[in-house]
Amino acid sequence: MRERLCGVYVITEPSLADPLESTEQVLRGGARLVQLRAKSATTRQLITWGQAMRDRTRQYNALLIVNDRLDVALAIEADGVHLGQDDLPVPLARRIAGNRLLIGVSAETVEEARQAASEGADYLGVGPMFTTVTKPDAGTPVGPARIRQIKQVVGIPVFGIGGIQPENALQVLQGGSRAS
């Protein structure tokens, strides 16, 4: 499944747009990866949204990734889970999920990226690229140059994340992101 980790990677944000409507729109527009991210949603709401999003991503032969919640990813038969630095460690997530799920990890520094790759992460989300309103605690933007630095030390796909908008997406791609 790792070979399918390319193309536009979209992260949903229910406070900005309905996740089901936005998933449909981005898939029609060519996105190949969609991440269900809804920090304040209940488990039941995540499962409801996740099952519907899973149906849509299958129709478009796209991947569905669940943010933070390995239990939800397994329950809805998602394609992967995306873990932050304070979430479940990659080796434990891999022991629980086996090879059923892709495991992505957020990395801000080269060292975090190197560690995630050595622990068995399938891909990295590097950022924040720019200031983001959807994750106020994201930290200081690292910019697209960080992607190049990280790609020099890891052999897994790297995506830019955080604050990416149509007007700055090209900078992220030029930085070496698999897509964003």
Question: Which residues does each PLM region occupy?
Answer:
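Conserved N-terminal beta1-alpha1 strand-loop-helix module at the mouth
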Residues: M1-V90, R94-D122, G139, Q149, ...
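Short glycine-rich anion-binding loops that position phosphate/pyrophosphate groups of nucleotides
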Residues: D87, M129-T131
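Glycine-rich beta-strand-to-loop/alpha-helix junction loops that act as flexible
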Residues: V126, F159-I164, S180
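Phosphate-binding beta-alpha-beta segment of Rossmann-like dinucleotide-binding domains, i.e.
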Residues: T131-T140
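Conserved cofactor-binding/catalytic machinery of classical short-chain dehydrogenase/reductase
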Residues: R146
